[in-house]
Amino acid sequence: MQAQPIHARLMNGEVLSQDDATAFMREVMSGDMSGVRMAAALAALRVRGETPEEIAGFAQAMRESAVTVKVRPRDVLMDVVGTGGDGAHTFNISTTTAFVLAGAGVPIAKHGNRAASSRAGSADVLEALGVNLDASPEVIQEAIDTLGVGFMFARNYHPALRHAAPVRSDLAARTVFNILGPLSNPAGATHLVVGVFRADLTRTLAEALRHLGAKGATVVYGDGLDEFTVCGPNTVSGLRDGEIIDRTMHPEEFGVDLHPKTAIVGGSPAENAEITHALLTGGGTPAQKDIVALNAGAALRTAGRVGTIREGVEQAREVMKGGQGWEMLQKYGALTKR
């Protein structure tokens, strides 16, 4: 008897192995799957909820189909990225954090896009800061290998996603694609801090990253934000040495004050670029400085560069005061325009 096609198995409630999930997504990425079959499968997954193995399999196929950035091997290559879709309209916290980390000497391969639910995504604000988003993969590779930082504009690195775009648009609802971007870094990031839009996703994505071979990861839901928040508790799943630990973290544990959500709201790309510039040159408001320091501190701990998040927060504050992150951003912007 002929085996059922994967989309039919999903519609029947079957859970896929990681290999079968990869096979399904390869068919999507190749353009060989009809829109009806794709929509049925995505809807079935949405209703049931994706397993870590399925998410890892889908992400593996996305990685295979991506344009890659062939950086030299290293022990740590970090991405700090959110799924987007939190609707909080904050300034560009993860983008600012990435350059603080680069200023602290952590190699960064940031992967991002234009705005999902805010007015300015990472690509929008970096463009406003003078970065050429369309720099070639070879230029990005050179930037990561020589400067220690690079930004990959997702649209340019995942051309096969065009095959899923019409169905995603027609469904007009979140699907597994909304969480795959952070898991599909074209440079092969080894360590990640991933922000998610629902608390129940932290463990799921940490397990998926373990299946994908990540050396270290921190997945966080920040009380309504897809990053660490300074406005309330953080739901965190941390992957270290193959073990995953779930916990709730409060900003005060790390020497960071609590602030209202209104204190971290952003605006247009130009307005957010001004905030990023201020923070990377020792300025910014207390809330802005605290939330970037907390996110950078957690990333420094994830990368193994400090023993505790509190130590990381203090190091991040020193980098912001010293302007090393801004220096990195200026050098990177110039390199992308060559």
UniProtKB/Swiss-Prot annotation:
Classification via InterPro entries = Anthranilate_Pribosyl_Tfrase (IPR005940), Glycosyl_Trfase_fam3 (IPR000312), Glycosyl_Trfase_fam3_N_dom (IPR017459), Glycosyl_Trfase_fam3_N_dom_sf (IPR036320), Nuc_phospho_transferase (IPR035902)
Spans through the membrane: none
Cofactors demanded by this protein: Mg(2+)
EC numbers: 2.4.2.18
Chemical reaction(s) catalysed: N-(5-phospho-beta-D-ribosyl)anthranilate + diphosphate = 5-phospho-alpha-D-ribose 1-diphosphate + anthranilate
Write out the residues that bind 5-phospho-alpha-D-ribose 1-diphosphate.
82, 85-86, 90, 92-95, 110-118, 122
The residues the record assigns to binding Mg(2+) 2 are 226-227
Q: Name one GO biological process term.
A: L-tryptophan biosynthetic process
Q: How is the cofactor bound?
A: Binds 2 magnesium ions per monomer.
- List positions binding anthranilate 2: 168
Q: Which major enzyme category is it?
A: transferase
- Binding residues annotated for Mg(2+) 1, in chain numbering: 94, 227
Q: In which pathway does it act?
A: Amino-acid biosynthesis; L-tryptophan biosynthesis; L-tryptophan from chorismate: step 2/5
Q: Which GO terms of the cellular component aspect does the record hold?
A: cytosol
> Could you cite one Gene Ontology molecular function of this protein?
anthranilate phosphoribosyltransferase activity
UniProt entry keywords in alphabetical sequence:
Amino-acid biosynthesis, Aromatic amino acid biosynthesis, Glycosyltransferase, Magnesium, Metal-binding, Transferase, Tryptophan biosynthesis
What does the entry list as the binding residues for anthranilate 1? 82, 113
**Keyword flag Metal-binding:** yes
The family classification in the record reads: Belongs to the anthranilate phosphoribosyltransferase family.
Function per UniProt: Catalyzes the transfer of the phosphoribosyl group of 5-phosphorylribose-1-pyrophosphate (PRPP) to anthranilate to yield N-(5'-phosphoribosyl)-anthranilate (PRA).
Subunit and partners: Homodimer.
Q: What is this protein called?
A: Anthranilate phosphoribosyltransferase
Its lineage opens with: Bacteria, Thermotogati, Deinococcota, Deinococci, Deinococcales
